[in-house]
Amino acid sequence: MKRHGILNSQISKVLADLGHTDTIVIADCGLPIPAGVARIDLALELGTPSFVDVVRIVADDMAVEQVTLATEIKAANPVALEAVMKLDVPQDYVSHEAFKELTKQAKVIIRTGEATPYANVILHAGVIF
């Protein structure tokens, strides 16, 4: 058994396999998941686990170079936006429709139980050196 970091074996494997600029998505429970994109479904009930918790834990174990968010998060979900801003990496904003198109390129979408609007982020992998 691991002593530190993410215990979920699927997420641990995805993070270990990422290369520079690869992307993963952390999503609320309503974001459509495109055909062909791997899904790790953590949702247990509405709100559990939260977007904020999953972002914090995954980002602590991942070299994040940049994030992409839907522009709509700025007005609709300041709590989720604040959680992402704490990562202290450059942010790119696109429309929600463009965001959904970008998810088609992700290595995986991690679905949380979050049930608030636009609580979705694309994490771009950096390097550890």
From Swiss-Prot:
Q: What name goes with this protein?
A: D-ribose pyranase
Keyword Isomerase appears in the UniProt entry:
yes
Entries under HAMAP family matching the protein: D_rib_pyranase
The alphabetized UniProt keywords are: Carbohydrate metabolism, Cytoplasm, Isomerase
What do we know about how this protein assembles, alone or with others? Homodecamer.
Native source organism of the sequence: Exiguobacterium sibiricum (strain DSM 17290 / CCUG 55495 / CIP 109462 / JCM 13490 / 255-15)
Q: Which residues form the active site?
A: H20 (proton donor)
Pfam families tied to this protein: RbsD_FucU
Metabolic or biological pathway, per its Swiss-Prot or TrEMBL entry: Carbohydrate metabolism; D-ribose degradation; D-ribose 5-phosphate from beta-D-ribopyranose: step 1/2
